């Protein structure tokens, strides 16, 4: 049952009508079983002073594209009711006319565009109105016998409105239906949702919760868990087995769904998902259609349901079915588009947003991790609706044509237009070794600033987590992900890539940056020192690149690797034979990989920096003292020494290297591979030739 979250003490602090509306809206949006993410809308009617100081009656309503759970006052739109109410006398009004008219009614031009369902709120005479999409209510509204069952629950207290797309016509239908039923306490919108109201904000919220719980109690009394979704056909595999399977198939899925534009993936194996994908009736039930019009833009009409018998030994069989399934889904979506398109429509990516695998769970796709999560969150709601509707009778959905018209509805697409424009690294995942250090952390910030998701791999997990947290605080949840990895440990490297595959679906950019440095005269260089440099800078770079190469080949959508070499890759560093030799190995390894990677669209380039002291764990250790001794100067004189030996007389900083990495990772260098670029201020001895 839905719990009331109303707090009298907190509510009493909200003194204005708008403040009370924000509070109520946030409570409603905090429970996704009550309101879809980005869905629903709320309003309040109040009196404010206009710019002339006169009292005017205003309705504040949710602005288009915002989410009730996180809305602030600035996300609501104020409209003059004196201008809106006469519209109910009209016989018809197009969407375009409605949007233009409401624009003239706004009390502040800086407010967002008003919700699509603004007139629904305005035409009802109540001070506070909620429109929500509760699981229990939509279960009732999507049951083939929903109207009859509603009479059992609510008697004559409800109004049933047949499905009509939101806008003027639906708003007028609702108002007239409510006016004609003096006992009406709620509106049930077929295949859509719920409308409730009250004379105070608290009364409105309490009514919303009460009505939902009446429906939920009715449904739960009829749920038979054993026969749910036709009964269990495929029990869930063990959690560790599910994760292992997903880590191996995610790159295949990512490649299959990313042929036109790359996608970020996420994995979900929550209990309700596993119950649904394991049901005997679920393959057919999942193809009936969307559970709510609000879902369509993010989930498409139906998911891709994979016909596969769970078997941990049949990974290759699952991969084949996934590739075939995605291809068939795209073809069907193309046909759906062609059959229903209107003039001027441009087809979205045809790949599925939701992929269901028996025994394993759900894979969601999107242009970002956050949007893949939106698809997943909405499909959780769809599962809940199908659970309820099938317990009541038969689950029914919109026609294919109406589903299309909602999915491609200009008023829905307007919400998508509010998102920031995509930038160079949008839809891409970067894997950065040495992610906690100066170059690694600066590179992560640089790539994320242009849309990337980044993985920070480092032995210093605490440091990597700190950088990731700072990035996520600024750019949003899970834009950065930290993990502990020893580049010299083959199993650790393989495990890290498996982790990333589960987290995001795969990788596009590898920054091979983990490092160390030692200094000794050649005749004093021990085998231990030699092996240490070769293990980290040679074997480590080899393992990171090899596993990335495998993953990129599996994806089949190309990729870019950037090796962080050194001036010493091409320059004989004094008292640094082990380090210099290992750095030379890195540079040549990169060229070798570039020679093999071309046919797969995998580019490999190398940056040769010099003397990056800022934020460097290497330079803050013994290496600083050793290099100073090699040059016969004091450690605190090193930065100035290095600056003066450059032809440009400059110091080099992590941000300079990050800029070079961004160039090699970007489309600006899409025809460049096997290249070395110095970023050292100009050290003549290291000029490549």
Language-model segment annotations:
Residues 566:
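Residue(s) in the substrate-gating loop at a strand-loop-helix junction
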Residues 673-689:
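Short C-terminal tail/terminal secondary-structure segment
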Residues 1-430, 442:
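Glycine-rich flexible loops
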Residues 550, 595-596, 670:
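Alpha-helical segment proximal to the catalytic Tyr-Lys
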Residues 545, 582:
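Active-site helix of classical SDR
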Residues 511, 598, 603, 672-674:
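Short, small/polar-rich loop/turn modules that mediate ligand/substrate recognition or access, typified
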């Amino acid at each position: 049952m839905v719990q009331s979250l109303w707090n009298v003490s907190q509510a009493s602090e909200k003194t204005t009508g708008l403040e009370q509306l924000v509070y109520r809206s946030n409570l409603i949006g905090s429970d996704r079983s009550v309101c879809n993410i980005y869905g629903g809308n709320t309003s309040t009617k109040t009196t404010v002073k206009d710019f002339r100081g006169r009292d005017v009656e205003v309705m504040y309503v949710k602005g288009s594209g915002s989410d009730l759970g996180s809305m602030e006052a600035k996300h609501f739109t104020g409209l003059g009711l004196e201008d809106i109410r006469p519209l109910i006398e009209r016989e018809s009004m197009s969407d375009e006319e409605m949007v233009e008219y409401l624009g003239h009614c706004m009390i502040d031009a800086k407010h967002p565009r008003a919700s699509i369902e603004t007139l629904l709120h305005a035409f009802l005479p109540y001070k506070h109105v909620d429109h929500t999409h509760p699981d229990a209510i939509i279960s009732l509204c999507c049951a083939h016998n929903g109207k009859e069952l509603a009479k059992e629950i609510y008697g004559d207290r409800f109004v049933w409105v047949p499905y009509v797309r939101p806008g003027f016509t639906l708003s007028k239908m609702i108002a007239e239906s409510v006016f004609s039923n003096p006992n009406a306490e709620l509106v049930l919108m077929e295949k859509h949702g719920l409308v409730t109201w009250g004379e105070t904000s608290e009364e409105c919220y309490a009514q919303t919760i009460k009505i939902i719980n009446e429906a939920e109690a009715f449904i739960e009394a009829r749920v038979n868990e054993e026969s749910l979704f036709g009964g269990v056909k495929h029990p869930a595999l063990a959690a560790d087995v599910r994760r292992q399977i997903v880590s191996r198939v995610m790159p295949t899925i990512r490649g299959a769904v990313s042929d036109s534009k790359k996608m970020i993936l996420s994995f979900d194996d929550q209990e309700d998902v596993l119950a649904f994908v394991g049901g005997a009736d679920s393959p057919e039930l999942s193809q009936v259609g969307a559970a709510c019009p609000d879902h369509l833009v993010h989930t498409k009409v139906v998911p891709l349901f994979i016909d596969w018998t769970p078997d941990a030994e049949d990974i290759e069989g699952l991969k084949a079915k996934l590739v075939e399934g995605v291809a068939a889904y795209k073809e069907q979506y193309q046909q759906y588009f062609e059959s229903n398109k209107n003039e001027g429509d441009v087809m979205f990516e045809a790949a599925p947003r939701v992929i269901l695998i028996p025994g394993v769970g759900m894979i969601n796709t999107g242009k970002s991790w956050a949007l893949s999560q939106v698809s997943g969150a909405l499909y959780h709601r769809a599962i809940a609706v199908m659970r309820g509707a099938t317990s009541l009778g038969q689950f029914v959905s919109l026609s294919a044509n109406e589903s299309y018209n909602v999915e491609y509805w200009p008023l829905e697409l307007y919400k998508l237009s509010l998102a920031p424009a995509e930038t160079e690294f949008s839809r891409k995942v970067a894997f950065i070794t040495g992610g906690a250090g100066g170059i690694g952390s600066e590179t992560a910030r640089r790539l994320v600033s242009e849309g990337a998701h980044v993985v920070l791999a480092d032995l210093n997990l605490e440091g990597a987590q700190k950088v990731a947290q700072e990035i996520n605080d600024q750019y949003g949840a899970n834009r950065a992900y930290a993990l502990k990895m020893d580049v010299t440990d083959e199993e650790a490297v393989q495990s890290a890539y498996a982790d990333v595959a589960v987290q995001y679906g795969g990788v596009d950019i590898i920054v091979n940056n983990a490092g160390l440095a030692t200094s000794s005269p050649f005749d004093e260089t021990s085998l231990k020192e030699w092996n240490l440099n070769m293990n980290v800078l040679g074997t480590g770079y080899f393992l990171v690149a090899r596993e990335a190469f495998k993953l990129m080949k599996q994806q089949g959508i190309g990729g870019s690797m950037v090796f962080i070499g050194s001036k010493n890759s091409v320059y004989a560093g004094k008292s640094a034979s082990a380090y210099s030799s290992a750095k030379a190995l890195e540079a040549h390894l990169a060229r070798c990989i570039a020679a093999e990677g071309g046919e797969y669209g995998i580019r490999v380039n190398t940056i040769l920096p010099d003397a990056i002291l800022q934020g460097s764990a290497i330079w803050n250790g013994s290496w600083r003292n050793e290099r100073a001794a090699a040059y016969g100067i004091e450690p605190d004189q090193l930065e100035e020494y290095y600056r003066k030996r450059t032809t440009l007389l400059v110091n080099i900083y992590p941000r300079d290297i990050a800029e070079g990495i961004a160039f090699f990772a970007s489309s600006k260098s899409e025809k460049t591979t096997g290249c070395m670029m110095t970023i050292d201020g100009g050290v003549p001895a290291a000029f490549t030739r």
